Amino acid sequence: MSRYKYTEDNPLKVFTAFSGYDSQCLALDRIGIPYELVGWSEIDDNAIRAHNALYPQYAGRNYGEIQQIDWKQVPDFDLFTYSSPCTDWSAAGLQRGGAEGSGTRSSLLWECRKAILEKKPRFLLLENVKALVCKKFIPYFNKWLSELEDYGYTNYWKIMNAKDYGVPQNRERVFCVSVLGDHDIYHFPLPQELELRLKDILEPEVDDKYVLSDTAIEGFLKHNLNHLAKGTGFLFKPKEVDLPEEQRICTSSKGNGK
């Protein structure tokens, strides 16, 4: 955005869909771009509480369900972020896909079309799981990019890994930046050398409360059945590993579908 000058008197106007606690705003704070959050869209109670704790000044600007938003009533904005639910793309979920009209959570991506056509924001930012561009799902992604091109956007996308940008986690995600009209060519940031690694953070002795008990594992497995019955959510997939106890790290892919 170096070509565009945003100041305290002329801040970047932002709308975040599927906001969560709005890591997008945290990023803008970190890189020092003045902005105003003209609106956000979130329905998860816990995420809303976290958002309001971080940004109390914007507590009254949550537009709720994206399907119900009348975009004519929303102030104009320059940046639209739309990291729609990954539940039905993710390898940790049921991979039901996100075809338009399918009713899956991931199909909410197509609801963003209304916002883009009505407000024509200068910048779009999408982040989602790597599976979005796998062989099974990339036709949906390509169709979406083609639509954006029809609307006048140029798209730049890349699979990026958190470990290449200063975070000691192997976390690959798809990022897509779309720019409306004439603009300077966008370049994704170059990878950085990782200075902090997981071994620098983990404690040599771990309290028992951080180790999953047999009872907890059984509870997670039962929770799987509820998700499967509803056709939603991530699944808990325990894996037996033959490692010395001091080398084991207990994790799960349990989630609430967000």
Q: Model-flagged regions — what are they?
A:
Residues 15-67:
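SAM cofactor-binding core of SAM-dependent methyltransferases
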Residues 69-79, 89-258:
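Class I S-adenosyl-L-methionine
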Residues 12:
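Nucleotide donor/acceptor-binding cores
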Residues 8, 32-34, 74, 118:
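Alpha-helix termination/capping residues and helix-transition junctions
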Residues 84-85:
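Short glycine-/small-residue-rich Rossmann-like dinucleotide-binding loops
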Residues 20, 35, 58, 81, ...:
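Short, functionally important structural connectors and interaction interfaces within domains
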Residues 40, 63, 81, 125-126:
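Generic enzyme active-site microenvironment
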Residues 1-9:
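A short, basic/flexible loop-to-alpha-helix module at the beginning of a structural domain
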